[in-house]
Amino acid sequence: TADLSGANLSRAGLGKAEVWKANLSGANLQNASCDDADFRWANLNRANLVNARLRGANFSEANLGGADLRGAYLEGANLRGADLRGARLQGANLSLSNITTANCEGTILTGCRVYGMSAWDVHLTEANQTDLIITPAGQPTVRVDNIEVAQFVYLLLHNEKIRGIIDTIGAKGVLILGRFTEERKVVLDAIKVKL
């Protein structure tokens, strides 16, 4: 594995580079072009990736703890299982990325574009997730303050079937608490059939 800790790779062309398991801790990759690069299991702890192009890059299981990814272009990137604790991603484009099972504790995610992001089982304790843009570029901007509800809100806004289901549940849902005699239960069952 390559030891590039502290290396100055600013503006470097690393497209499709295979640097998996490499030590890039503290490295400067500001404005680097790393589209489709393979960073699996790499150590990028406290690395500077400000405004880096990382489209389709694979950071699966990588250590990005404390990394600076402000303004980074991560569209379609794979961050599954990555350690992003304390990372700064203000203004990053995470559209169509996969952050499933990533550790984002204490991560700053303000102003990120998250359209189409896969975010199942993400650890978000104390993460700052405000002004997340859930719409794709070219559509009116809609912002939410929670990654876990971003996709749901987008579907509510753009999918008539989902809206119809929610409306039906709200219109027909009735909560009845208590104990009922057999005669009253018959009446309740009749009401249920009508609804």
How would you label these PLM feature ranges?
Residues 1-150:
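Tandem repeat scaffolds
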Residues 148-195:
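Conserved N-terminal substructure of TIR/SEFIR domains
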